[in-house]
Amino acid sequence: MLEGLQGIHAPSWIGRSREAVEMGERPLDLLPHQSPQQQPLVRKHPVSGEKSLYICEEKQMDFVDGPIAGLESGPQGAGAKLLRELLRHATRDEFVYVHEWEPGDLVIADNRNLLHCATWYDAAQYTRLMWRTTVMGNPGEEYAGEEKTWIPRDGSDVMAGMENA
């Protein structure tokens, strides 16, 4: 049922999130490489072969044209209902790991099979130092030959045009 469906992902600040659509915000005018990106809802890990959902929270999905391509769009559409059902499933207790941080901890995660989020901490009491690295690699066969539409063709900065965003 899910294989073959495409989620429409969009940055939260461009006015296409569920909340922005419900509040009547006008989506930002974007350069072609900044537009929402369609991604398969089900991806197969290129090493383990394990299938997993590739979804984001409602702030990072496009509710103007989606969030699921080919299904009724908008916050009350069939695509939104399916996304909420998938998020409820993916965040069930048996699928959730909560790290209890200790000084010196290092967490390494494979984002190809991971839905993650930040959690609250007491910034007045604790110092938080986070470093993120991204390892480039093969995201899976679903992307073989994919044109990287989020990279400007003219070599300009990826964030060009976002001065007023």
Residue ranges and their predicted role:
Residues 1-106, 112-165:
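Non-heme Fe(II) oxygenase catalytic core, chiefly the N-lobe of the double-stranded beta-helix
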